[in-house]
Structures are given as structure tokens and as C-alpha cells.
Amino acid sequence: MAVQPSPLGGFFHHHNRRQPMPLHSLMTRRTWLGAAALAAAACTGTAAFAQAYPNKPIKIVVPFAAGGATDVLARVLAEKMTVGLGQPMVIDNKPGAAGIIGTDAVAKAAPDGYTLLLGLSNSMLTNQFLYTKLPYSPERDIAPVYQIAIAPLVLVAHPSVPVSNGPELLKYIAANKGKVAYGSYGTGAYPHLAGAYMSQSQNADMSHVAYRGEAPMVQDLLGGQIQIGFASALQVKAHIEAGKLKAIGVSGERRMGTLPNVPTLAEQGLNDEAYRVAGWLAFGAPAGTPPAILERLATEVRKATEQPDVAQRIAAMGFDVQKSSPALFAAAMVKERPVWERLIKASGATLD
């Protein structure tokens, strides 16, 4: 591409008489023109690449086994996005190590828009604080594409606990030091971290009971073996409506669509950021993927999640659909990062 003469060229004339250009000025001008030409070529090449994208199938890496909730949603989104992108989207399940294996594969893939990650907040954010030898850096190696949905949890209590809201619960556990037990279903997951933080902040010395899954934890809540716990709406909504569990409040920034009458803990005055964060589901890409391609992908994800059948599927999983973009998702991660780091360090949780 021909480079037009620089307007700065006029400054090298003295009156109407042309003077020899000093060597350093000549080199500066040539360097500037060369840089401008390279930048223009790079921009043109990137723009052309983005306009031609995609011209082959796109792989979505799901770092979990086939048949799980994340995998099912990935296939639903892939079907919808294929229409808008005009190319097949192929699911590639790479389970193992709490999402690390699949996420690492994406982190090391070519940043060309043909390999995507559909992951959870653990592999894309919190694992870096739980593992000392994580093979990738979420911030350095994964580019945010779109935060699909968040998964706030419900803080529930056994009916024998004489409280009905967050502030009352904090007073109760402080007044009954060492007498209250909370449950969780995964070291380093939010129910564990939030319970540990609540206990420490109130000097309550609550007992932590770890379960191999959410269902057995809820069963012990129903039986009164433990008194409180954070759980998904899917697991506890029916028990709340039947009066078998008390809904104390919801984590996250806003009320859950499936439990609209249960206020957030923040609404109740528990303003610590520890009660405002929640797990999430999102798309990522290898760092270095051209911004225009990230925006194109984000647009197609948004279109897919706005379709009623997809939105209903996400809600059925206990997630709340988000309106997102690469910039909004990146900002959310920057905001949440220190909160999760603080919670994990306070709990002492490690996974390696």
C-alpha cells in the first residue's frame, strides 16, 4: 500500500530554497514513515482478517465431562451461534483437575478466534489462588469474551435457628460461639469461603462440614445436623416453599429471578463485598485474539442468550442471564479478583 507524503514534510523547507535535510532528521522522518506504514498495514491486515472471520469451524473447549450442565449449555449455545457465525461450532470436552486441563489447552491455543473456552469462575479466576502451580495465568493467558450468567446462592438455615434475615444470623452465630455448623460441597467453592469468612468476621468459631456434593449437604440441613449453608436455588427452592428451610438471603448484586421475594444479603445491610460476589459461567479466548473477533463472538453470544428457549435453559440451571461484552466482563473480573483472593486466603483453602 502506497504511503502518502507526511504533512510534516513542509516543515523541512526554509523560505523557498530547498536545503539538504540533516541526517538525523532524515532518519527520524524515515523511521516515522516506516512505523506509520507498518501500523497501517497491521490495521488493514487485522481488519481484513476480522471481516473474513470465521471461515472454518470454531472449537468450544468445555473443561468438564460430556453430559454435565455446562456441556449441555455449551451445545445449546453452539447450535444458536452456528447460525449467526455461518460456521459449525464443535464441542471439545477436556475434563480434569477442576477445569484446569481444558482451560490450559485454550490458554496455549492460537489466538485466532477458532478456539474458545466455556468455563466457570473457578478455572477462569479463583483457581490461581487455590493452586500454587497453575500452568496458566487467567489474566495473562485468557481474554474475556462474554460473561453469560452468574450463579448466586441462597443462604439457608434450619427452621430451628431463630433468625429470619442476615443481620439476625450474624448476631446469633456470634452469641452462640462454637455451637453452629455450616456446610459446603467443595474446598475453595463459595459456600466454603463465605461460611469461613462469616465465622471469622463474627468470631463465631463455626464448625465447617465438607460434603461430597450439594445434595447430601442439603439433606443434613433438612435433618438439622448442620444449621446453615449456602446452596443453589435448584436444590433448596422447594424446601423453602414447603417451610422446611429458611431463606436468609441471596449472595450477589441482585435478587434471583427464580426467588424474587428473597432479598440479597447486601439489601439487608451486609455490605461486605464477600456477600456480593457469585460464581459465573463465561466464554474466554486465548490472549491476543483480535478485539474485533472478540466483539463479533460476544455479539453472537448475546443474541443466543436473548432467545427465550436459551434463557429458560440457563434459568433452569439456577443461573441468572447477564448482559455482557469483552469490556464489561474484563471490568467485572478486575473488581472481583481481590475479593476472591481475600476470601480464599482467609479460609486457608488450598488444592495442591
Per-range role (PLM):
Residues 9, 17-18, 22, 55-57, ...:
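An extracytoplasmic/periplasmic, membrane-proximal ligand-sensing/linker region
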Residues 49-140, 179, 187, 203-232, ...:
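N-terminal (or domain-start) structured segment
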Residues 28-33:
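N-terminal export leaders
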Residues 120-121, 159, 233-234, 252-253, ...:
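Short secondary-structure boundary segments
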Residues 108-114, 129-216, 265, 270, ...:
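Hinge/capping helix and adjacent helix->loop/strand transition within the periplasmic-binding protein
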Residues 45-47:
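N-terminal signal peptide c-region/cleavage motif recognized by signal peptidases
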Residues 11-12, 49:
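Aromatic (phenylalanine/tyrosine) cluster motif
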Residues 137-147, 205-209, 227, 237-276, ...:
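Short beta-strand->loop
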